[in-house]
Each structure stands twice: as structure tokens, then as C-alpha cells.
């Protein structure tokens, strides 16, 4: 069971909204979100209702302002709890072309720089064979984030991206 608390103001001040399950639109309860406390579980939060727009992955901890979760502004509207599978291994295959074609790169560990490790700047498709992964738009786990659970992603839009730029990625662990 997870629990996340959203606050309108920085440093856990102002009105708050608590969630212990997925919520497709909490904007009616909060006009803005400037701080978050994750009491348990891992969550993906979205800037728009119905789990759309920029996404941010948060684990247990305190985020006193939106820069701490790499947010671009104080707008958040929906959230989903991430469900881990016990004893999960981690394995991902990245492809430099869509539909699982072209050069394939495989990893079982975090990668702070896709360019340094694989000599490519773009991921056009991927298969998450085990575990939960986060793609980042920039090296060293910065920029836009994309949560990828076990499954196949034939093109960047399948994981929520508009372009194939993936500069780093890491495993999401409990």
C-alpha cells in the first residue's frame, strides 16, 4: 500500500491532498502543487489529468519544492501508484530503429550516459524484459522522465515521448 501527500505551497505548507491509490484528477482539490511527501510506495505523477503530460517518478521521501522532483512548474493533476513484482530481475533491450529493428543494446544495470555506453543518442523502440525502468531525456538522470514497465514499446510515443531522445536510464527499485 502506498501513500503520497500533495501540498499547495513549498515546504509542506498550505492545503493538502492525500492519495493511497491512483487518482485521475485531483486538480479540483488543489490549484497548484509545490511540495510532496511520499510516505510509502513509489509513484508516477502527471502534469495533466488522466495520467497525461509530463511524468515524474517519485520514491519514498520529501520533496519541499517542485525542482526537487525535476518539475517544470507547480502544475500536477494525476498520479498512479507503481506496483512492484517481488524478486524481479532487471533486463531491458534498446533498439536504434523502430519496431525492434536495427542495432540492439541490452542492459541489466543503470546507465548514466547512453552515448558513452552504447554510442547512440536515440532509442526508437525497446523491450522491458524484467523490472521497471525510467528513461531520462538527458545524461545523469535529468530532464523528462518516462516510466517503462514490463512490455514492448515499438516507438517513443508508446512510452509517452514525442521524440527518441534517451540519454540515460535506470532501474526503479523498491
UniProtKB/Swiss-Prot annotation:
Has a two-domain beta-structure, folded into four very similar Greek key motifs. Crystallins are the dominant structural components of the vertebrate eye lens. Pfam families: Crystall (PF00030). SUPFAM superfamilies: gamma-Crystallin-like. The gene is crygs. Transmembrane segments: none annotated. The keyword Repeat applies. InterPro entries: Beta/Gamma-Crystallin, Beta/gamma_crystallin, G_crystallin-like. Residues 2-40, 41-83, 90-130, 131-173 form the Beta/gamma crystallin 'Greek key' domain. Belongs to the beta/gamma-crystallin family. This is Gamma-crystallin S. Keywords: Eye lens protein, Repeat. One of its GO terms (biological process) is lens development in camera-type eye. Residues 84-89 are annotated as: Connecting peptide. SMART domains: XTALbg. It comes from Cyprinus carpio. Signal peptide: none annotated.
Amino acid at each position: 500500500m502506498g501513500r503520497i501527500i500533495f501540498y499547495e505551497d513549498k515546504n509542506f505548507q498550505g492545503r493538502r491532498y492525500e492519495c493511497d491509490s491512483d487518482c485521475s484528477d485531483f486538480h479540483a482539490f488543489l490549484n497548484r502543487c509545490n511540495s510532496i511527501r511520499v510516505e510509502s510506495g513509489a509513484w508516477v505523477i502527471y502534469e495533466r489529468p488522466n495520467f497525461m503530460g509530463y511524468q515524474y517518478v517519485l520514491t519514498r521521501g520529501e520533496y519541499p519544492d517542485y525542482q526537487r522532483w525535476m518539475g517544470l512548474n507547480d502544475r500536477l493533476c494525476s498520479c498512479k501508484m507503481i506496483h512492484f513484482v517481488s524478486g524481479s530481475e532487471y533486463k531491458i533491450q534498446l533498439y536504434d530503429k523502430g519496431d525492434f529493428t536495427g542495432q540492439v543494446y541490452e542492459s541489466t544495470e543503470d546507465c548514466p550516459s547512453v552515448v558513452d555506453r552504447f554510442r547512440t543518442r536515440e532509442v526508437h523502440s525497446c523491450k522491458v524484459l524484467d523490472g521497471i525502468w525510467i528513461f531520462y531525456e538527458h545524461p545523469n538522470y535529468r530532464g523528462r522522465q518516462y516510466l517503462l514497465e514490463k512490455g514492448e514499446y515499438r516507438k517513443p510515443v508508446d512510452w509517452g515521448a514525442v521524440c527518441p531522445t534517451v540519454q540515460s536510464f535506470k532501474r526503479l527499485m523498491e
